């Protein structure tokens, strides 16, 4: 199973965000958000797709190089790529679905590309599972 991590990044007390990083091959597909996925009262929310990050970020905590602040791990676990299968073709996809199995975030999450805001912005929401 691929791994994921949610890091909380801080530059100072007023400048912080969360990064959701999803393992795909030798890199982490990364989205920046104002709320972590486990805080469902903050969802849906707009997230920004960042460049891929190194796998080392799965374990990264503490100071970030080049004076970019510091980070702590908010959540981690494994996940399953539901759409697109295996995470292949994300660059062309308009929708991504993953099933997270972490310490805090559990369940299916959907990211839908926001056509009005440009290719880098997506809407993140938790999918309600039918019983």
Model regions and ranges:
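A charge-rich, low-complexity, intrinsically flexible signal that marks solvent-exposed coils, linkers
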Residues: 1-131
């Amino acid at each position: 199973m691929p791994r994921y991590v949610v890091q909380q990044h801080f530059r100072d007390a007023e400048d912080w965000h969360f990064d959701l990083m999803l393992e795909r091959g030798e890199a982490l597909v990364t989205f920046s958000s104002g709320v972590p996925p486990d805080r469902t009262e903050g969802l849906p929310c707009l997230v920004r797709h960042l460049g891929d990050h190194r796998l080392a970020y799965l374990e990264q905590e503490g100071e970030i190089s080049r004076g970019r602040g510091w980070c702590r791990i908010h959540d981690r676990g494994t996940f399953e790529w539901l759409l697109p299968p295996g995470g292949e073709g994300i660059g062309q996809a308009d929708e991504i679905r993953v099933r997270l199995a972490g310490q805090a975030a559990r369940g299916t999450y959907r990211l839908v590309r926001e056509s009005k805001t440009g290719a880098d912005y997506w809407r993140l929401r938790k999918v309600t599972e039918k019983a």
